[in-house]
Structure formats: C-alpha cells, structure tokens
Amino acid sequence: MTQALAGFNANGLFLATDSRATRFTAGGQPEFFHLQKLFPLGENCAILGGGAGVSVPLSLALRQEIDRRRGLNDLEEIVEFALPFLSQGYGAYLRHHGPEPEGFRRVYFIFAGYDPAMPPPGYQLFLLGSEDNELPLRLIPAVNQVVMPRNLGMEMRLHQALATGLPLEQLLQISKDFLEKQAQIKEEVGPPFYYATITAAGYREITL
C-alpha cells in the first residue's frame, strides 16, 4: 500500500510518499519490499501511484506512452488520456491475476502539474482511483490537497498550512513528520520517503 500526500498554494506544489509495497506469497502471506512510486511527466507534471502495487508499472507505462506522444504536455489532456489508459491496464491486470486480497483492492494515481496559462497560481491536482477493483477508474474531486489513504487529522493540518501560505520547505517538513509517524504505526508504510516540488521552474526531486 502507500501513504501519499500532495498540495499547493501560491508558493508551489509538493508531493510526498513512502516507498513500501506489499506482495503475497503462494500461501497468502504478505511480503514487504521497496520501490519508487513518484515520477515526473515531462518538465511540469508528475504522477504518484498508490494502493495496489500494480500502480507503479501502470504509472511507468503511462509515462512511456506520454513520452512517445510528443505534444501531450497539458495536465488536463494527460489526465483525459490517462483515465482510459490506466483503466484498461488495471483491467488487464485483474483479468490475468484476479482480485487482490481483501483490504488491498484499492488503486489510485495522483496527477500534479503547473500550467502558466491557467489563472494564478497555475497549479492543479487530479486524483484517479478505484475501490474494490471497480472499473473503469474514477476521477475523484481534489481541490488543492490530497491525502491518500485519507487521514482527517492530516487533511485539516494541511488545509491550515496551505491557507496560511507556508513555504514549500515547511510543507515538506510537515509531510516528512507525518510519513515518519505513519511508518511507526502502520507496517504497510515505510521508508525511504520520496519528495518532489513543482514550481514555475519545473519538477524537482527533494532530499530531506
């Protein structure tokens, strides 16, 4: 599974995620391993996959297809293309492998980006997801923040932090503290943690 969060204000957009993933042995026992879940899409956009582990190969397949289709740079156009692409990929995975064990039947993708042609501040977040292996994936409303899986306490804290105009450095530190706390109480969440920002200067990986 994944613990991920993203948000933006006038100072920029940030993304943060853990790297622990779960697979199951032939006997149905969970095994944990680590993999990167956060990837740039061009210069000003990013995708963060979460939930079922298949989100990562689907994210990489989407990135490869976007790279192949030159000119697909606008985040809204990317999301419009990604919705059927990821739905088809997830459907093929389920047909081949069957449903995941109970409690692991969620997959989601956070799309983030900057577009100078949009009204200020020019940042966007989109969330595509599926619960209980539902197909096709759905576009889930997101305004200027996403916390997945949802955590009401963190959502309130992040809402206040964004509203007060905290700089990206402080928003990233809040995210780091949250991820570390979740790793202490949830075995499916763990380091290393990955962070990135998107500003008018583009996508940037951050080390904390």
What positions do the PLM features span?
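N-terminal nucleophile
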Residues: 1-208
